[in-house]
């Protein structure tokens, strides 16, 4: 039947086939919280929020802010872990740490230098592990970066693999 409106008429004999493809991970920040939470990983079971093994209170606070921010995107079950980096044996690792506590192998993945003030947030892939690294010299910058990632409208504007976050933004 013809209908002047922009509607599709579905009858009892209509057959619909709907397909979707899983996008490749582009390592861009606007995709956050993907791949930490996705259709293939709805409860975060393949992801971990990790702090340095020598974590202090500021690192733990920022990590908890990230966990809370992702809570709305998780399915009813939350299987994502909060752990020390040495225990983060997951495919996707969201790392929060002060530069002085960050292992050299993670610092070597960064393509930009960690600023003296503020934080560097960068998506990188190392082998089979996808990382979101949040590294700062100042404690307050870690919470500021976590607040940025908890704001979906700000994250949607980050069409790059890294950004700098200033304290007080």
Which residues does each PLM region occupy?
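Solvent-exposed alpha-helical segments and adjacent loops
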Residues: 1-169
